[in-house]
Amino acid sequence: MSDANNTAGDANEVNPEKDLSAENLPGQRGQGGEEIRVQRGMFGANNGGDTSGYGGLVRSVRLPGPASRPYGGWFDEVADELEGALEEQGLLPDNAIEKTVVDRGELTFHIEREHLVRVARTLRDDPALRFELCTGVSGVHYPHDKGRELHAVYHLRSITHNRLIRLEVSAPDGDPHIPSLVSVYPTNDWHERETYDFFGIVFDDHPALTRIMMPDDWQGFPQRKDYPLGGIPVEYKGAQIPAPDQRRSYS
């Protein structure tokens, strides 16, 4: 009976290497972090004939702020090893890492763009880190995040240590350049082309940065939030389907 109780007790103990439930709880939106805009009305639209009352909604739009030590679980181990490895290369961690975010049980390093390649190579090659795989890059457009409107988010996986982190890099609309990581993670080739195609982020030193989804002569970048609703007519089974901005309105 005693052994059974001990076994049950062991099973119920929290394993800090695997259980980050406290950080994994959804944070309360609008509390803490960095406010980038105030959204009014439902879905940000407040000039319609709303009679529901939702047009009066006011919501603070925030990005997660920097976390404080200890981060929890293995996050501190990764952060310590990364900072130590950068120092060994003569690079001060504070000059390379803009901030470290722990949000919803996930670890994200915000990196100064000029140091992105060195940080990524360190994460890949250091034996205690060994993030061998980058599963892709995602683009994000925050028009109200002044001076850093364009974000590129890299998702790194350590197969050796079974860990997942992110690197996030920002650039202003007026200078949308971020170093390419194809030299470190060759599988990013098409992902960076797609992010360029849809968001207009220019990945410097990419071997062939051309559009991958849209026609070569397409104007603009369709997934940016300032991209106008529009398009071109499409022929389908002999019928012409008008572009979205030319279709009949039923409202």
Curated annotation (Swiss-Prot):
Its EC number is 7.1.1.-. The keyword Cell membrane applies. It is an enzyme of class 7 (translocase). It holds the Pfam family Complex1_30kDa. Keywords: Cell membrane, Membrane, NAD, Quinone, Translocase, Transport. It is a peripheral membrane protein. Residues 1-34 are annotated as: Disordered. One of its GO terms (molecular function) is quinone binding. It is found in: Cell membrane. Signal peptide: none annotated. Its main location: membrane. It comes from the Bacteria. One of its GO terms (cellular component) is plasma membrane. It catalyses: a quinone + NADH + 5 H(+)(in) = a quinol + NAD(+) + 4 H(+)(out). PANTHER family: NADH DEHYDROGENASE [UBIQUINONE] IRON-SULFUR PROTEIN 3, MITOCHONDRIAL, NADH DEHYDROGENASE UBIQUINONE IRON-SULFUR PROTEIN 3. Belongs to the complex I 30 kDa subunit family. HAMAP family: NDH1_NuoC (MF_01357). NDH-1 shuttles electrons from NADH, via FMN and iron-sulfur (Fe-S) centers, to quinones in the respiratory chain. The immediate electron acceptor for the enzyme in this species is believed to be a menaquinone. Couples the redox reaction to proton translocation (for every two electrons transferred, four hydrogen ions are translocated across the cytoplasmic membrane), and thus conserves the redox energy in a proton gradient. This is NADH-quinone oxidoreductase subunit C. The gene is nuoC.
